[in-house]
Amino acid sequence: MDQINHTNVKEFFFLELTRSRELEFFLFVVFFAVYVATVLGNALIVVTITCESRLHTPMYFLLRNKSVLDIVFSSITVPKFLVDLLSDRKTISYNDCMAQIFFFHFAGGADIFFLSVMAYDRYLAIAKPLHYVTMMRKEVWVALVVASWVSGGLHSIIQVILMLPFPFCGPNTLDAFYCYVLQVVKLACTDTFALELFMISNNGLVTLLWFLLLLGSYTVILVMLRSHSGEGRNKALSTCTSHMLVVTLHFVPCVYIYCRPFMTLPMDTTISINNTVITPMLNPIIYSLRNQEMKSAMQRLQRRLGPSESRKWG
C-alpha cells in the first residue's frame, strides 16, 4: 500500500463566488462600501458616547464596547475577502488560516457574552431601578466587559487547540471566503467525528440554548414593562426591541451554522456574508435610529464640531 503523505498543507484555496470578473468587481464595490459604512458607523457611536457626558452610563459604555467589537469582528474577514475579489489566486496560508479562526471565534465569543451583559443591564434597570446604580456601579460593568473579552479568548483558544493536532495532507480547497472552521475540519486527513461532535455540542447547542435564554430574558423584561407607563416605558421598550433585533441577527446565523452536521449547503455563503459583512453594519443603524438619546447626542456633537470647522475654513 502507498504510504499516506502527512506533510502539512501550506495554504488553503477559496472557491470563487462567481466566474465573472465584472460581477466580482461589482461585489467588491458593494462590500467595500458596506465595510466602510460598518467602520464609520460604529466609530461614530464610539466617538459620540466618549464625547457626550450624558451618555456615560453602563448601557452606553456597553454599547460603545459592542461597537468596537463589531469593527474588530468585521475586520477579521472582510479586508481579506475584498482583496480576494480582485485577485485571480484566492489563497490563505495555513498559519494565517489558524490565526483567522482564532480571532474570528475570539470576537464572536466575546460578542455573545457582550449581548448577555447588555441583557443583564436592561433587566436590572427595569426590574430593580432603585438598586440599579449600586448594582451596576463602574467596578461591576468594567469587570463584566473584561470577563466578556476573556471568555471570548478562552473560547477561541479551545477551538484552535483542538484543531492544531490534526494533519492536513491532501485536499485544501474551501467553499467559503474565509477560514470557516467547519470546512477546515473536514479537510483533515484523519477521522474528525469526535471533534465534529464536540464542536456541535460546544458551539451549536450552547449557542442555541444561549439564544433561547436571551430571548426569554427580553420577553420577561417586556412583560415587566407592561406595568410601567409614560415616556420611560416607551424608551425602555424601544431599547429592548433594538437589543432583541441585534440578538436575533447575531444568533440565527450561528444556530444555522453550528446546529447541524458538518456539511456544505447552498445557503452557507449567503449566511456567512450576512453574519460577517452585513450584520456589523446594521448594528449601529439599529442602535442609533431607534434611540432618541443617541440621535440627540450625535446632533449635539455635530453642532459642537460645526463652529470650529467654520473657523478653520473661514
Swiss-Prot record:
Ranges in the topological domain labelled Extracellular: 1-25, 80-100, 159-195, 259-269
Pfam families in UniProt: 7tm_4 (PF13853)
GO molecular function: G protein-coupled receptor activity; olfactory receptor activity
Keywords, ordered alphabetically: Cell membrane, Disulfide bond, G-protein coupled receptor, Glycoprotein, Membrane, Olfaction, Receptor, Sensory transduction, Transducer, Transmembrane, Transmembrane helix
Membrane topology, as annotated: Multi-pass membrane protein
Cytoplasmic-side positions: 50-57, 121-139, 220-235, 290-314
The UniProt record lists the keyword Nuclease: no
Protein localization: Cell membrane
Transmembrane stretches, start-end: 26-49, 58-79, 101-120, 140-158, 196-219, 236-258, 270-289
Keyword Glycoprotein belongs to the record: yes
Residues of this chain annotated as glycosylated in UniProt: 5
One Gene Ontology CC term in the entry: plasma membrane
Superkingdom assignment: Eukaryota
Disulfide bonds: 97-189
Coiled-coil regions listed in the entry: none
Function: Odorant receptor.
Family statement drawn from the similarity comment of this UniProt entry: Belongs to the G-protein coupled receptor 1 family.
UniProt name for this protein: Olfactory receptor 4D6
